[in-house]
Regions:
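Patatin-like phospholipase
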Residues: 1-42, 50-260
């Protein structure tokens, strides 16, 4: 067991556009005086996490990322290693990130990615930010792997979609936001839809396996009604994360755990 050197750790799952719900989750916590001392995120959680760690508020980030169209985030490419490019997200990070390295961030951050050469989860916490956040967000089939030091990396959700591992032994309290509930889908059409669905199904096991490690874990079931590649509902997703978290924070057992 490591020394619990941080008071509160935030853990943010992957989930594509559903990650806007993370921002509502954080907004509700902030209103109750709960701020992260360290953050661990995968994919969309890495994107939200790096901007929070850089000093932006949840509503700042909502405004920054709420562009309205998936084409503002990603572009079709020749399907050699991936169907899409994350060029829009890279552009947003280049334009807005004040920190250039993990060491420059205001809050310590872990970013989970999958080393596909060695078949394992990797938790980045040092060096260049943008390439490692991009690696964490590179959904297989949809996006090309990111090569760092001759190793190919894909989305952290392949191996760890709720990355509590880096912080579970060093935080007194851990709160988490999971945005990947999966419900019934009647029909899937097109390669991108099938790839998206397959990836999401692989990630659902995380909540049941790890729920006991959290003092508060928010996983709004209504998120199953939103696609992971459709950012058009950003305001709705933010509100869903916010309202679900506010409701959870009215529970006296949770309030005692969080010293509220």
């Amino acid at each position: 067991m490591g020394e619990k050197i941080y008071d509160t750790g935030f853990v943010l799952s992957g989930g594509g556009a559903r990650g806007f719900a993370h921002l509502g989750f954080i907004e509700a916590l902030n209103e109750n005086g709960i701020y992260p001392d360290i953050i661990s995120g995968t994919s969309a959680g890495a994107l939200a996490g790096v901007l929070i760690a850089d000093g932006y508020s949840p509503r700042d980030i909502l405004k920054m990322l709420n562009l309205g169209s998936r084409l503002d985030f990603m572009r079709p490419t020749l399907p050699r290693e991936g169907l899409l490019q994350i060029s829009g997200i890279i552009k947003i990070l280049n334009a807005n990130l004040r920190a250039k390295s993990f060491e420059d961030l205001k809050i310590p951050l872990y970013v989970a990615a999958t080393d596909i050469n060695n078949g394992k989860a990797v938790y980045f916490s040092e060096g260049d930010l943008i390439e490692k956040v991009t690696a964490s967000m590179s959904i297989p089939v949809l996006f090309q792997p990111v090569v760092i030091s001759n190793i190919q990396y894909l989305d952290g959700g392949i191996t760890d979609n709720l990355p509590v591992t880096p912080v579970e032994n060093i935080c007194k309290k851990i709160v988490g936001s999971f945005v990947n509930p999966v419900g019934y889908v009647e029909k899937l059409t097109g390669l991108i839809s099938i790839a998206e669905r397959t990836f999401m199904l692989n990630m659902t096991k995380e909540v049941t396996e790890k729920a006991g490690k959290f003092d508060l874990l928010v996983a709004p079931p209504e998120l199953r009604n939103y696609g992971i590649l459709d950012p058009e509902k950003a305001e709705e997703l933010f509100a869903l994360g916010y309202n679900t978290t506010k409701a959870k924070l009215r529970d006296e057992t949770i309030r005692r755990k969080l010293d509220l």
